[in-house]
Amino acid sequence: MCKAVIMAGGEGKRLRPITCTLPKPMVPLLNKPVIDYCIELLKKHGVEDITATLHYLPNVIMRHCGDGGKYGVKLSYSIEDAPLGTAGSVRKAVGADARRTIVISGDAMTDADLTEAMCFHKARGAAVTIVLKRVSVPTEYGVAMTDSKGRIYRFLEKPMLSEVFSDLANTGIYILEPEVIERIPEGEKYDFSKDLFPALLKEKMPVYGYVTDRYWCDIGDIAQYKAAQRDMLDGRCAFTTAAKQKDGAWIEDGAVISESAELLGPCYIGSGAEVSEAVVSDYSVVGSGARIGRGSSLKRTVLMENTRVRENAELRGAILCEGAEVESGASIYSGTVIGSGSRVGKNCTVCNGASLWPEKELREDEDCTENLQWEEDTPKPGIMSRIRGYCDRTMTPERAVRIGAAFARSSGRLPLEIAVSTDGSQQGV
């Protein structure tokens, strides 16, 4: 049996403000984090010993995934204090384990046939097999050229348009023999595409490319994030879901939907969501615990967990992150992301492409035409101010300790003991 490493340390800067409070592998697709689909895919193909490499907001992933028991796998973690690169992080995660290793990116959606890829790897006697996918725009990925037997003889990471020599893109799924992993320097920043693969090709090592015809989408930016969910609702990707399909709408148990609501599929409604006399249509996704008020209309919109859309609001191509609120009469248009815990006031308009970073607020009747970010009005808390955020995200243990230390210093009487406590809820004020 082989083991697997999920590369899950990505920060996902191009997905901000979604990833301001979520690590990239925790971004939800149809109400379930991307990393869940990765673990389920590995389990499906018989790989049950998994290590996830973590760096950005690691506690969010560990709290959600636990020890892997809920997936039927054994899941451990390798946390990087400083980024080690793709290969360096895998080297740290594998350690002295001498088994063949499957590496998979924790921020891509795929139903690739890993069993078939493994058979290909063994039959070729490969030191490394890279799973490849034909794409129309290869400049965003590493590209490879293979001979008739699949052996890679040319590889280039993210070529310029003038440098493109192939449409075979690197999916970030690798099968590695132990001797290859041993070549990766320990404790150093080292990359598969920029360092390891070029070195192996230079030495004429047997590096092969398995071309998959299954679905694969890198969740690299907002457009790809939306596209992946459209593709899933269109049936282009095989995946497991708790929802049942009815008249084009996917509905999880526990959703509360008014008899007067219009669900014009394809769309997805998560457990515990409440939909009043509203319209949800055109690939919209409503996460668990989200609530939609009477007279509101959603098209091509994603509501993450515990969001609130009040009466007569209009959302077109928007994304609401966890805990965001939209008041009555507000209008939010295409390309907009409302960050975690943010609030769009009554009768406000958020124009195309403008976004609110977490914990921002638009007051009644305001228009937003550009991004409202943290830097624009950094809060300066006074004695009566409050600090608000999600545990392990904006409210990390380190930040809580710094807050306690700041209170102690400001008292003017040292030594002084300050207690930092929690009531166990996810959101703290």
Task: Specify the residue positions occupied by each region the protein language model found.
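N-terminal glycine-rich phosphate-binding loop and ensuing alpha1 helix
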Residues: 2-62
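Conserved beta-loop-beta/alpha segment of the NTase-like Rossmann-fold superfamily
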Residues: 62-148, 183-185
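Short acidic/polar active-site loop segments enriched in Thr and Asp
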Residues: 2, 48, 99, 127, ...
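Glycine-rich hexapeptide-repeat left-handed beta-helix
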Residues: 279, 294-387, 391-392
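Extended, small-residue-rich solenoid/repeat segments and analogous flexible loops
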Residues: 188, 201-297
